[in-house]
């Protein structure tokens, strides 16, 4: 759109143009968008000026996200630019039902800035819709990824601590490439024959760990929704097996299902 005669362009057309910029924006367009913002801010119409302010706010937010994402990539790259680094994380340690799931992800950490994956963070801080969108992107862009699980019966037999470590170990060992380094969230992975560094709050610092947390979360949530189709009384489709009041009351009323962790129910039954 040519904005040289901005005063003659209707507000709705300008708004449509502004919305399109936000949807299709790439960082290479930054200078062009800044020029557009300047023109909108000089318009005599208050609603057009507000569009310029909103576009400026969008641009600032984009730059903040670019910086945050670059920091997460650089956090991993500091271990070695030519290293294959795997991030590994688990989900489902605490639920009363279902498996514990882990994912390991190897990303190309040397990819050009604008080819990086944006909006990645701790999976718990993302909406379900955003996690599912990022899950697809991570799988497409990853050099390798692998998902592993330990079921509820094994958790009962071996304990949650063993199962937690085992599922992380399986996720890493199932990768199609052997990483030079494994970054794990919070604590080290025992009996792993690959160099391992554990990062406190790693899913908010490491792009590789955060990516693995998203894949693991989406995979497990999908599993629990499938289980819910035959066990709808427990509400697995929205509680994912965690001990909500609704879930606890359902266990007391209907008894445990085939996917419940009996060792977690001693204070309920």
Curated annotation (Swiss-Prot):
Its cofactor is Mn(2+); Mg(2+). Belongs to the RNase HII family. SUPFAM superfamilies: Ribonuclease H-like. Disulfide bonds: none annotated. Its EC number is 3.1.26.4. GO terms for cellular component: cytoplasm; ribonuclease H2 complex. It catalyses: Endonucleolytic cleavage to 5'-phosphomonoester. It is found in: Cytoplasm. Keywords: Cytoplasm, Endonuclease, Hydrolase, Manganese, Metal-binding, Nuclease. Endonuclease that specifically degrades the RNA of RNA-DNA hybrids. Residues 83-269 form the RNase H type-2 domain. Manganese or magnesium. Binds 1 divalent metal ion per monomer in the absence of substrate. May bind a second metal ion after substrate binding. This is Ribonuclease HII. One of its GO terms (molecular function) is RNA binding. It is an enzyme of class 3 (hydrolase). One of its GO terms (biological process) is mismatch repair. A divalent metal cation binds at residues 89-90, 185. Its main location: cytoplasm. It holds the Pfam family RNase_HII. It comes from Clostridium botulinum (strain Hall / ATCC 3502 / NCTC 13319 / Type A). Signal peptide: none annotated. InterPro entries: RNase_HII, RNase_HII/HIII, RNase_HII/HIII_dom, RNaseH-like_sf, RNaseH_sf.
């Amino acid at each position: 759109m040519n904005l040289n005669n901005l005063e003659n362009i209707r507000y709705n057309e300008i708004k449509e143009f502004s919305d399109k910029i936000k949807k299709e924006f790439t960082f290479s367009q930054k200078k062009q968008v800044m020029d557009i913002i300047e023109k909108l801010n000089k318009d005599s119409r208050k609603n057009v000026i507000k569009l310029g302010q909103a576009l400026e706010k969008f641009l600032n937010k984009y730059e903040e996200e670019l910086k945050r994402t670059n920091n997460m990539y650089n956090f991993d790259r500091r271990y070695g630019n030519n290293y294959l680094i795997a991030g590994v994380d688990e989900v489902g340690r605490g639920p009363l039902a279902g498996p514990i799931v882990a994912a390991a992800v190897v990303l190309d950490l040397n990819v050009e800035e604008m080819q990086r994956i944006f909006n990645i963070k701790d999976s718990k801080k993302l909406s379900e819709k955003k996690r599912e969108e990022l899950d697809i992107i991570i799988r497409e862009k990853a050099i390798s990824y692998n998902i592993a699980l330990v079921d509820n019966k094994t958790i009962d037999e071996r304990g949650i601590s063993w199962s937690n470590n085992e599922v992380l170990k399986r996720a890493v060992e199932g990768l199609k490439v052997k990483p030079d380094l494994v970054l794990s969230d919070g604590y080290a992975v025992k009996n792993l024959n690959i160099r391992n560094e554990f990062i406190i709050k790693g899913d908010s610092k490491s792009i590789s760990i955060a990516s693995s947390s998203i894949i693991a979360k989406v995979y497990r949530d999908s599993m629990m929704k499938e289980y819910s189709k035959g066990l709808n009384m427990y509400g697995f489709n929205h509680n994912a097996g965690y001990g909500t009041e609704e879930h606890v009351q359902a266990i007391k009323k209907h008894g445990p299902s085939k996917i419940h962790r009996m060792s977690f129910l001693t204070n309920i039954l």
